[in-house]
Structure formats: structure tokens, C-alpha cells
Amino acid sequence: MGGYITMETLNSINIPKRKEDSHKGDYGKILLIGGSANLGGAIMLAARACVFSGSGLITVATHPTNHSALHSRCPEAMVIDINDTKMLTKMIEMTDSILIGPGLGVDFKGNNAITFLLQNIQPHQNLIVDGDAITIFSKLKPQLPTCRVIFTPHLKEWERLSGIPIEEQTYERNREAVDRLGATVVLKKHGTEIFFKDEDFKLTIGSPAMATGGMGDTLAGMITSFVGQFDNLKEAVMSATYTHSFIGENLAKDMYVVPPSRLINEIPYAMKQLES
């Protein structure tokens, strides 16, 4: 592969220091779309990951049953009804980066949410596609928008999206599939692989203690937040992915399993430690 994300590589990428005269509008306007009536935890983890990663303004479009929990667990985020198309259109227009998928569900409502987003997203925006949204993309096979698109599949989701069975997912076949797809891909696995248009990277840190539900939602939120804050997409994706595994590996030294909510709490401390 093209290179390895190690601490040395991250040092050259770095997490930028915040400017003294900055304000919340300088750190990304984020929209998260997901969380069906039964899967609200996924979008909540993603939202909290955005908050703890430093996003300036966060809006969550989710099922009304999740609103009270979000207000309680993530008061920093604004919350709107995912079914309110007028408000959703307004928020899409105001947003820099959009994450769709965590807890979205794969029924017709999820299909409709993706179709609506693709009709309204603009070329200057960033789109991060995770979880259920990847499954829906695999079924609908819509034309990708002209904005910058990042997919964050685990191995089974990548099988659906690429058509490559898990046991046949070699680097060469994955690279060919990414080229056909025409997007950035963060393939979540032991030794996560990141595919860009012109080069690829393999993560060399992490821990099996991170193999728990919600960890991918957390990573998707971090990637969305970093991409919304930092100008260079490649550096943002690599920095978010590295930081996620960096925290997990460190926590695993003292914890048998690393809950995503615990990892989220450590994000700002790790970012400070890795700050340029």
C-alpha cells in the first residue's frame, strides 16, 4: 500500500492549533442524519463524537422519539425532525459537512432520506456515508454527487458496496473497487485501510478491545467533525482515524473493553496531545 499511518506520518499531518481570534463558525457547520425510532443511540454517539472533536455548530436530524434523549445527552447539538423536509432543506443549505447513516434504518424512510439528501446537497459540501446509508447506497446504486464523498464501511458493508466477498477483499481488488466508486473509503477492520484517489494508507494501531457496538458510529462522527474543521480532506480523514485508534489503544492498556462513550470523552485530550 502507499504508506502507513504512524505517529511520524501524523506528525507531518498534525492537528492544527486553534487561532486566538476564532469563533464557533470557524470550526464547521455539521449536519447528522440518522437515528430511527429504535436506533437512536447510533446517531447520538456520532453527535457526541462531533462535539468532543470540536465541531462548532452541530444539528441532528432524527426521529422525534430521539429528541429528548439527545437534548439530555448531547445538549450542545441542535435537533430537528428528520421528517420535516422544509427544515431539513434549510439545514442542508447551511452546512459544510453532512453525515448520513448511523441508525438510519434500511426501510423506505431511510431510502427517502438518502434520495432527498442527494437532491439537495451542493458541490462545495462534504458527504460522509456510514452504516445503514452504505447498505442503501448498495441497493439503490445512485449516482454520487459532485461533492467530496467519504464511505466508512466495515467489511460486510464493503462487501455489499463493492460486490467483493470478504474472503476475497485483497488490496488490489479493493483498490479497483474504490477507483470505480470514485470516492474516499475508510475500510474499518483490524489494520484499518484508507483509500484516497491517489494513495492509500494502513493503520498500524488499535485494539480488539475496540470491537464493540457503536465504535463505527463514533469514528464516523470524528471523521465528519475533522473534515468540517480542517481544510485538507486527506489530512482530516487520516487524523480522525488515527486519533480514534490512538485513544482506543491507550484505553485498552487498562480496560478489557473500550466502550465508545468512554472513547468519546477522551477525544479532546488526545487531540491536545497530538496538536502541532
From Swiss-Prot:
(6S)-NADPHX binds at A42, G105, H154, D217. Its EC number is 4.2.1.136. Its cofactor is Mg(2+). GO terms for biological process: metabolite repair; nicotinamide nucleotide metabolic process. It is an enzyme of class 4 (lyase). Pfam families: Carb_kinase. Residues 7-274 form the YjeF C-terminal domain. Transmembrane segments: none annotated. Keywords: ATP-binding, Lyase, NAD, NADP, Nucleotide-binding. GO terms for molecular function: ADP-dependent NAD(P)H-hydrate dehydratase activity; ATP binding; NAD(P)HX epimerase activity. Disulfide bonds: none annotated. AMP binds at G216. It catalyses: (6S)-NADHX + ADP = AMP + phosphate + NADH + H(+); (6S)-NADPHX + ADP = AMP + phosphate + NADPH + H(+). HAMAP family: NADHX_dehydratase (MF_01965). Catalyzes the dehydration of the S-form of NAD(P)HX at the expense of ADP, which is converted to AMP. Together with NAD(P)HX epimerase, which catalyzes the epimerization of the S- and R-forms, the enzyme allows the repair of both epimers of NAD(P)HX, a damaged form of NAD(P)H that is a result of enzymatic or heat-dependent hydration. Belongs to the NnrD/CARKD family. Homotetramer. This is ADP-dependent (S)-NAD(P)H-hydrate dehydratase. It comes from Staphylococcus aureus (strain NCTC 8325 / PS 47). The gene is nnrD.
